[in-house]
Every structure is written in structure tokens, then in C-alpha cells.
Amino acid sequence: EISCSLVGSEMCIRDSLKGNVGVIYPTFEEYPNRKETMNIVAYIPQNKDFSYTSEDIRHFFGNKDLEALLIINPDNPSGNLLSKDEVMVLLEWSRERGIRLIIDESFLDFARSGENISLLNNPMLADNPHLVVIKSISKSYGVPGLRLGMAATSDMELINKMRKDVSIWNINSFAEFYMQIYGKYEKDYQKACRDFIAEREHFFRTLQDIDFLRVIPSEANYFLCEVIGRFTSHDLTDILLKEHNILIKDCGTKKAFQGGNYVRIAVRGRADNERLVEAMKRL
């Protein structure tokens, strides 16, 4: 039996796992923030793009005592993507070691060939009870106010643990209605994803024209950029907001950046993307 539970995505980490959890930094910090620091085994890729492969992961965590390994694919904020082959290698490796593999696919719809990489299907889950797939529906469909997310696994013991801590009214009427109708627009959504990927490629090229940014390639709906030269990440974020009413994310305080200057820039529509580029060119 496969069970999908609509829960806060970090609940799988917070309430259901008591041992050590492997986390790759930089990351979506709501996950490690739900655990005691002593229970986080942190891996920071030692390269300028914070990229990694399945081999890197196995090499680092191979001699570590883990109950679970968390993979965000594509990652947040780096946009790093593991291929289907690499994910399958980790799936088998974690099974052999008795490690629960938690994969967050919240941004996978934005990746090229993302549908082919996903492990969110019944046969895959049924064959791998140590696998948990998490997806934040609100991120990919652009409805953050609805607070929709799910965890899917064939491990009923784990699902039952999570369900005990879910509020009896964990989905409001707006979210429930959305879940009833969103399937009608699947073709529109798929087309929007294809259009988005094309726009992301265009935005990547235009951002590279900004002399104080080093843009890191991404398979998500954002770019992690290193701010170099005459600005700090804080200064750039502050100027864009105050002078141009444009908000980007200052990542300088995130773990793994070690005081470096990094920002995360969302990929939006052509007009908004061009407005941001023009604003930065005038700085």
C-alpha cells in the first residue's frame, strides 16, 4: 500500500526521525532547523558552484552514522540537479546501508527532463519502503498561500507517525478546492513549464552580462549568484529594493557560504526579468 500524506514538508524530519540526518549545504534551512545540531551531518561541496554528484555523496557519507539522507533535487538554493541514474544509485546505496532516503522534488517540474527523474510513482515507492518523496505543491504551482505539500512512501509506520501530529484541519477549504480542480489544467501547466525553461535559458544569458555577478547554472526556478566587485550581497539587495522596488534574496548569512556574498534571484516572466537586468546595469 502506498500512502500520501498532506503535511508540512519539514515534519518528516522534525517528528519522525530521531537519529542523524545527512544534509547537503547550502540548503533549505527549514529542514536542518527542525533537528538538533548534533544530529545533522553536514556536507559542503568544495567547489565554487556547490555542485555534487552521487559519487560525491557516497564518498562523504560512506563512513557516517546516518538514519536518513536528505536530497533536494534540484537543490535550493544552488539549483544543482542529480540525474535519474544518479538518484537510482543513491536509492540502492541507501537501501544497502539501511538509511532512509528522503528526496524533495519540490522544484523538479522546472528541470529539463524532470518528469523522467521523479521517483514519485507507486511501483518505485512500493519496491523501496526506505524511500520518502516530498513535494511542495505550492512552490511548483505558484500558490504559496495555500500551504500545500505531501510526503509519499510505502512505509505505513512512518506515515502513521506523521499523521498523529497533523492538525485535524490541516487543509483549508481553498486548498481543498484547488486540489479538486488543478488536474483540469495539467496540459496548461506542462506548457507553462516548457515556456519557463526556455525563459530561464534566456535569463541566464542576460544575467551573465552583469559584470558584478557570477551566475551559477540552475535547473530550478531561481539562480544562485555570487556578487563580486563593488557590492556586497547585502548592499545589492538593499539598493535594488529601495531604489527599484525589486526584491532578491540575500544568501550571505546561510551556512556554507562562509561570509561570501551570494544572492538568489527568482526566474520570472520576460518583462520582470528584463526589468531586473536593466536595473542592475544602471548600478
Predicted stretch roles:
Residues R14-I71:
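PLP-dependent aminotransferase-like
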Residues A42-I44, A68-D75, L101-E105, P217-S218:
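Short beta-strands and strand-loop turn motifs
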Residues H130-I216:
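PLP-dependent aminotransferase class I/II
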Residues I197, I210-H244, V267:
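Conserved PLP-binding catalytic core of the aspartate aminotransferase-like
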Residues S54-K64, P77-L101, E105-S140:
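Active-site pre-lysine segment of PLP-dependent enzymes
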Residues D85, K242-E243, A256-L283:
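PLP-dependent enzyme catalytic core of the Aspartate aminotransferase-like
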Residues E1-G8, C12-I13:
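Single conserved hydrophobic/aromatic residue that forms the stacking wall/gate
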